[in-house]
Design a protein with these regions (language model features):
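C-terminal segment of N-terminal export signals and the immediately downstream linker at the start
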Residues: 25-56
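Low-complexity, Gly/Ser/Thr/Pro-rich intrinsically disordered linker/tail segments
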Residues: 230-235
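Structured secondary-structure scaffolds
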Residues: 61-75
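Acidic/His metal-coordination segments adjacent to aromatic residues that form catalytic metal sites
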Residues: 53-57, 98-103, 184-187
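All-alpha RGS (Regulator of G-protein Signaling) helical domain and cognate RGS-like helical scaffolds
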Residues: 37-41, 69-72, 80-89, 94-180
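N-terminal secretory signal peptides and thylakoid transit peptides that target proteins
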Residues: 1-19
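An amphipathic alpha-helical core segment
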Residues: 157-213, 220-227
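Histidine-anchored, small-residue-rich loop motif
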Residues: 38, 53, 77, 199, ...
Length: 238
């Protein structure tokens, strides 16, 4: 987790600060794999579909709370925490990487990471999704897991087994091999050098209104009916 990244506007804002020293020392790395907002204050991302479009897997009621309250709450709190600080000039991913592991910056890290993760989650879903991937992604899945059914089972088992709050992820390692991992709380696999392709949110607020304690039913429904394979393929190609 030693790599750090900063956007070009940060050099001006960080002049004379400790963060500037980090930049000049080369501790902040190259451009982000995914860029979810370079301009602050950050805003709640626009969903790529109507808030009713994921029914019946995810209800409008859940979307209202999850997207409209929880996700928005992370955005608002992040803006509050970074106002008038050097972080206000940084991209979202740069903030996450710069604050990861720094206990004095835990509130900033948690909110920034949750904004990033939720942005990624909404893009990991699409109405009428699921089904079968194609092209190179399908080949990679077969190579890594045997076949699509085995992938689905492993993805489900991994996400469902996450203790407490967290996320299930399909990722690619540095060699391009696909893996399934889980992270707790606000953590994300790109902090460990893995490229996220898809994610499933297994915080209770993602499913409890619709599924109560039946996390497995929620996860399996998302995998079968909502996964956005086009998004995964785009990420794999980056």
């Amino acid at each position: 987790m030693q790599n750090r990244k900063i956007d070009r506007r940060s050099f001006l804002a960080l002049s004379g600060s400790a963060l500037t020293a980090s930049v000049l020392a080369g501790k902040i790395s190259a451009a982000p794999m995914l860029n979810f907002g370079d301009v602050t204050p950050f805003t709640l991302m626009k969903l790529p579909y109507a808030d009713s479009a994921l029914t019946p897997v995810i209800s409008s009621n859940t979307m209202g709370f999850h997207y409209g309250k929880h996700h928005k709450g992370y955005v608002d709190k992040l803006n509050e925490l970074i106002k008038d600080t050097p972080f206000a000039a940084m991209s979202l991913e740069a903030i996450v990487k710069q604050t990861s592991g720094d206990k004095t910056k835990t509130p900033i890290y948690n909110n920034a990471a949750q904004v990033w993760n939720h942005n990624f989650y909404w893009n990991s879903l699409k109405p009428g999704g699921g089904g079968k991937p194609g092209g190179k992604l399908a080949q990679k899945i077969d190579e890594a897991f045997g076949d699509l059914d085995k992938f689905k089972k492993q993805f489900s088992d991994t996400a469902v087994s996450q203790f407490g709050t967290g996320w299930g992820w399909l990722v690619a390692d540095a060699g391009g091999k696909l893996k399934i991992v889980k992270t707790g709380d606000a953590d994300a696999p790109y902090l460990d050098g893995l490229k996220p392709l898809l994610t499933i949110d297994v915080w209770e607020h993602a499913y409890y209104l619709d599924y109560q304690n039946r996390r497995a039913d929620y996860v399996n429904a998302v995998i079968d009916k909502l996964l956005n394979w086009d998004f995964a393929a785009e990420n794999l190609a980056k």
